[in-house]
Design a protein with these regions (language model features):
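Short, acidic, metal-binding catalytic loop of nucleotide-sugar glycosyltransferases
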Residues: 31-42
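A conserved acidic beta->alpha catalytic loop
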Residues: 32, 49-58, 100-104
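Glycine-rich, basic loop-to-helix element that forms the pyrophosphate-binding segment
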Residues: 75-91, 112
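Short aromatic/hydrophobic "clamp" motif used to bind/position activated sugar donors
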Residues: 96
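Conserved donor NDP-sugar-binding/catalytic core segment of glycosyltransferases
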Residues: 108-157
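A recurrent flexible, glycine/aromatic-enriched loop bordering the glycosyltransferase active site
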Residues: 156-199, 212
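A short, conserved alpha-helix in the catalytic core of glycosyltransferases
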Residues: 188-196, 200-205, 210-237
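Active-site-adjacent helix/loop segment of glycosyltransferases
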Residues: 230, 236-315
Length: 341
């Protein structure tokens, strides 16, 4: 998939909206984008539909009556990385931002991006702070789980399998309060409504379409390998709408675990045998429990700790099970291939 031009149209910001079977959320996201304070001629809003079957196409036709400059690309259901790449290939701006359909963007989102790159001409990538859009319990507990991970990565705190049993005391401690400032000293992905200068994709390539969801982690790894910094800009907040049930978060955690395995498998040269898988199973269970306790420990009070702990255990267990399940399937697939040969 080739980019149209190396630089794109100067002065144009392309905002790609990724969607799949979430027409209700998409409508809210687009309403927020078409309420931007930036001049309309400086914006290109492009929806990439990853093969929705819920009537998304009809919603787009309806919205296009109000916003005729809305662009729409529909593809067969191939996953988020392919949708990202489809959007990039069809975008014309020299700056490309990618947002999810469950985001609500503040009116100055586009202006914040263009102003940031104007004031920081050497920057190539910037991401923003994600907050919960609603204050219901499901949104609070789901966001807490993700936000603790963000805070850890802002502190560059690693929670690796090797460190769990060696530094339990340290991992039980609460994370330090991180002063909110523009920084590149973090371990965050180029996600969170991130905006890229178009030339980035000429340098490091497009998103890896084999990873399904861990493509932003992989992209960030390739960016850093080329010396391209990811700026974190916490002064602009993007509101994230979480699912209506706790099971939506559980499902996302399981999918996240599965894709962690795919990412691990891409960069690991180790062969995986059944003995190691059995060992992983034990470590994953222990790790899920310890990580859940650690996340709940970041709560502001004993009451919140006790309230959040069961959900942290549920989310962490789902993530670890997803990782182990993908590892097991990979091993089985490898064994089947060997047997056929």
């Amino acid at each position: 998939m080739d980019l149209k031009t190396a630089e794109g149209n100067p002065g144009v910001l392309s905002i790609i909206v990724l969607t799949y079977n979430r027409k209700r959320l998409l409508r809210g996201c687009l309403d927020s984008l078409f309420s931007q304070t930036a001049p309309r001629e400086s914006l290109e809003i492009l929806v990439v539909d990853d093969g929705s079957t819920d009537g998304t196409e009809e919603i787009i036709r309806e919205i296009s009556l109000r916003y005729p400059d809305l662009k729409y690309c529909r593809q067969a259901h191939k996953g988020i990385p392919v949708a990202r790449n489809t959007g990039i290939a069809n975008a014309s701006g020299n700056i490309i931002a990618i947002v999810a359909d469950d985001y609500l963007l503040a009116p100055d989102y586009a202006e914040t991006i263009t102003k940031f790159f104007r004031e920081n001409p050497g920057a190539m990538v910037v991401r923003f702070k994600i907050i919960a859009a609603e204050d219901d319990f499901i949104s609070r507990v789901s966001h807490f789980y993700l936000d603790v991970g963000v805070r850890r990565r802002l502190c560059c705190e690693e929670i690796s399998e090797e460190s769990w049993l060696k530094s339990l005391k340290k991992k039980w401690q609460k994370l330090p309060v991180v002063e909110e400032q523009i920084t590149t000293q973090h371990d965050l992905e180029a996600a969170g409504g991130a905006a890229f200068k178009r030339g980035v994709f000429k340098t490091v390539g497009l998103f890896d379409e084999s990873l399904l969801r861990a493509e932003d982690t992989d992209m960030t790894r390739r960016l850093r390998a080329q010396g391209i910094l990811v700026y974190y800009y916490p002064y602009h907040q993007i509101r994230h709408r979480y699912g209506r049930s706790i099971f939506a978060t559980v499902s996302q955690c399981f999918a996240s675990g599965r894709n962690r395995w795919r990412y691990y498998n891409k960069y690991s040269n180790d062969s995986v045998d059944l003995f190691r898988l059995a060992g992983w199973r034990i470590k994953e269970k222990i790790g899920a429990l310890l990580s859940a306790f650690w996340r709940a420990r970041q709560a502001g009070s004993v009451r919140e700790f006790l309230l959040y702990l069961p959900f942290m255990c549920l989310f962490e267990t789902s993530t670890k099970l997803g990782f182990f399940w993908s590892a097991l399937l990979s091993k089985k697939k490898g064994a089947d291939s060997t047997g056929r040969s």
